[in-house]
Amino acid sequence: MSREIKVLHLESTDVCQAACPLCSRETNPDFNKDIKNHLHIDQILQHFDNDAIANLNKVFMCGNYGDPAAGKNTLDILNYFRNINPSITLGMNTNGALQSTPWWSKLGKLFNNPNDYVVFSIDGLEDTNSIYRVNVIWEKLINNAKAYINAGGSAHWDMLIYRHNQHQVNAVEKIARDMGFS
């Protein structure tokens, strides 16, 4: 009996600018932040031929050690999957404060299928997000999310609720709706 891969979770990098206190990057004493790995298309080609990619239903990037937006080749890799398989669902989880607004606009245009998405992990508002999402610059995050949404991308705001931000849930819901998060 052969088993066909339908969903692929990729780690595009182990790089992240954030220092979230419960992240594996912060809690694993064996993790070396000085080694910076980036997935390359050559590595995809070594493991997946065009037929395998054409049969995938979904590719998503949700970093265990790095933020996919920090990957030097993330956009190229996602473009490659979409070019081989135009109906594939593409997804990504991010803190949103990496890359430039033009990069996020390109991603928003690429993520044009109905089920494509980016989950922005935003834990509160400007005064509370960086309490857990250490080193995440609020203005950059919001500008990147706007660029992605304005380019047609489907965005989800994912908020971890803590004592320090629980009073902001209603405000976050309103701002998320106003910005075009789904």
What residue ranges belong to the model's regions?
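Glycine-centered loop/turn positions within well-structured domains
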Residues: A18, D127, A155
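Short, electropositive alpha-helical surface patch
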Residues: I77-R82, S121, Q166-S182
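Active-site beta-loop-alpha junctions enriched in small/polar residues
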Residues: N64, N95-A97, D123-L125, L160-Y162
